Amino acid sequence: MLIWIPVDGNDEKNSRIVPQFEALQWALVDFDEGEVQSVKFYKSRDDLGGEWVDFIILANKFENYIDYMNEGMMVLVVREEKSIEDIMEAYKFKELDEIGL
């Protein structure tokens, strides 16, 4: 499954999640069989070219998320996690909060 995370850079180890309007890059995480398969970085979400993305993980619950839900994505929010590795570990153990209407 594919997961978007708005981040402050394009380094898989050092990039940190940021509010979507502060994102310098968008990390696209390919998560399958309980682990991260790959992480690719894009300048904008549109650069992916319309491929289906299952989840988006946002920095806080006050961000605009309705457009993502309209696109069919599940929207999750981090609690304390900042790095991609920590976020994906929390995702794996269902420790992220879900946003819903």
Predicted segments with their positions:
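Mid-chain, well-packed structural core segment of small domains
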Residues: 51-81
